[in-house]
C-alpha cells in the first residue's frame, strides 16, 4: 500500500478507510491538502490496527458490533496549523485518532480502553478524555508511539476555570 495507490475508499484495515483516517473538514473548507507521506501512511495503518483491536474488544464486551467513528486522525502540517494543533501533535504524524463509539459514552469508552491496557490487550501513549464540561465529552483522543516507549498517560482536557484555555488534568475527570 503506497500513497500513489490510495483512493478515498481504500481500506487501510477491515473497518477503516483512507478517507476517514485523512478526513479534515477544516482542510476542505480552507482548500488545504491533507495527504500523508509514506512514513505517515505507515503510522496511520498502525494506528488503525489498534483501533481495530479496540473495536473487537468492545464487540466482545457488549455482545454486539460496536462501530468506532474517527473524528480526526492524520493532519498535514498545514491542516494542523489551521486547527491550532501543537507542532508535536501525534495527529501530525498519523499516530493519533480522536474517536467515539456507537452506543457508548465517551467516558465509558475511555474507561474501556484503560481496562484493555490494564488487561495487556493494548498500549497507548496518551488517552485524553476531551472536554466533559460540555455535557458529553466531544471525543476520546487515542495517541500512539509506534517507534518509541509509550507513556500510558491518562488525561482530561478541560476549559473549566482557566479563562477559556485548554488545560490537561491527570486522570479521568467526568
Name these PLM-found stretches:
Residues 2-67:
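Active-site acidic/histidine clusters and adjacent loop/turn architecture
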Residues 40-43, 98-102:
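Short secondary-structure transition/capping motifs
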Residues 62-72, 124-130:
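Surface-exposed patches in mature extracellular/periplasmic domains of secreted proteins
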Residues 63-65, 92-96:
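Short connector loops at helix/strand junctions that flank enzyme active sites
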Residues 75-79, 104-106:
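Short, charged/polar surface micro-motifs in flexible loops or helix N-caps
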Residues 101-174:
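Catalytic cores and adjacent binding grooves of peptidoglycan-active enzymes
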Amino acid at each position: 500500500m503506497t500513497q500513489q495507490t490510495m483512493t478515498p475508499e481504500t481500506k487501510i484495515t477491515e473497518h477503516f478507510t483512507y478517507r476517514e483516517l485523512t478526513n479534515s473538514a477544516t482542510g476542505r473548507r480552507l482548500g488545504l491538502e491533507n495527504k500523508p507521506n509514506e512514513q505517515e501512511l505507515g503510522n496511520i495503518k498502525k494506528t488503525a490496527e489498534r483501533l481495530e483491536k479496540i473495536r473487537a474488544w468492545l464487540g466482545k464486551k457488549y455482545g454486539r458490533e460496536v462501530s468506532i467513528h474517527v473524528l480526526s486522525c492524520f493532519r498535514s502540517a498545514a491542516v494542523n496549523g489551521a486547527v491550532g494543533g501543537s507542532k508535536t501533535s501525534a495527529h501530525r504524524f498519523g499516530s493519533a485518532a480522536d474517536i467515539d463509539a456507537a452506543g457508548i459514552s465517551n467516558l465509558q469508552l475511555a474507561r474501556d480502553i484503560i481496562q484493555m491496557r490494564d488487561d495487556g490487550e493494548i498500549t497507548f501513549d496518551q488517552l485524553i478524555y476531551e472536554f466533559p464540561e460540555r455535557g458529553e465529552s466531544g471525543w476520546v483522543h487515542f495517541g500512539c508511539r509506534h517507534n518509541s516507549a509509550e507513556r500510558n498517560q491518562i488525561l482530561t482536557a478541560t476549559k473549566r476555570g482557566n479563562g477559556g484555555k485548554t488545560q490537561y488534568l491527570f486522570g479521568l475527570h467526568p
